[in-house]
Amino acid sequence: MRIDIVSIFPEFFGVLDISLLGRARQSGLIDLRVHDLRAFTHDRHRTVDDTPYGGGAGMVMRPEPWGEAMDEVLADDTDPVVIFPSPAGEVFTQAMAQELSAEPHLAFGCGRYEGIDQRVVDHTATRARVRLVSLGDYVLNGGEVAVMAMIEAIGRLVPGVVGNPASLVEESHSEGLLEHPSYTKPPEWRGLAVPDVLRSGNHAAIAAWRREQQLERTRRVRPDLLPE
């Protein structure tokens, strides 16, 4: 999978060189390309923003550097999905992560200030598949944190990135339910014991216990995930 990121803070994504995604990059499973938006400016101040038409607080990101950045990202004609993080977008879910993990090319545009000039989104949509995506009903300072979260969620679903694919099936949201509690050694710690069923060796009983724990936890914490 190829992933392009456009941001005024390219150094923000250095963390993607470590852990599972770092190894995925080294092995060629993920081709990550980070583009500095300011590299596409042509004034000595490397300006990427200006005051909004119609007035209002804050600044809006200018279309010219974004247009040139998108020209570079889209130059290979690979039909990517271009994602702009936005509180006005559709909510990111595990199902969306699964869907996007099957795409050969994703691109992310990290907005800042009061956002990106709408013409950038509109023009990009004539050249690629564009989606506005939100992490939830809150506002961040910029798109970088949201993009990091999405890449983490999507990248680990790319075949070969996670060593044991079975572990992905047991996680929260993989079946629309929250994950069951997990335990390891020692069998007792500070007066708290591991549930007997998990030490019984009875695989059917363990599976039933885990399923009930998933349902109970989902009913208590995220009842909206359960069918009506």
UniProtKB/Swiss-Prot annotation:
Residues annotated as binding S-adenosyl-L-methionine: G111, L135, G136, D137, Y138, V139, L140
Chief place of localization: cytoplasm
GO molecular function terms listed in the Swiss-Prot or TrEMBL record: tRNA (guanine(37)-N1)-methyltransferase activity
EC number per UniProt: 2.1.1.228
Highest taxon of the lineage: Bacteria
Catalysed reactions, as listed in the record: guanosine(37) in tRNA + S-adenosyl-L-methionine = N(1)-methylguanosine(37) in tRNA + S-adenosyl-L-homocysteine + H(+)
Keyword Kinase tagged: no
Enzyme class of the recorded protein, top EC level: transferase
Listed Gene3D superfamilies: 3.40.1280.10, tRNA(m1g37)methyltransferase, domain 2
Gene Ontology BP term (one): tRNA N1-guanine methylation
Pfam families: tRNA_m1G_MT
Subcellular location: Cytoplasm
Keywords per UniProt: Cytoplasm, Methyltransferase, S-adenosyl-L-methionine, Transferase, tRNA processing
Keyword S-adenosyl-L-methionine found: yes
SUPFAM superfamilies listed in its UniProt record: alpha/beta knot (SSF75217)
GO cellular component terms, semicolon-separated: cytosol
Biological role: Specifically methylates guanosine-37 in various tRNAs.
PANTHER family: TRNA (GUANINE-N(1)-)-METHYLTRANSFERASE
Subunit details: Homodimer.
Family of the protein in this entry: Belongs to the RNA methyltransferase TrmD family.
Protein name as annotated: tRNA (guanine-N(1)-)-methyltransferase
UniProt organism field: Clavibacter michiganensis subsp. michiganensis (strain NCPPB 382)
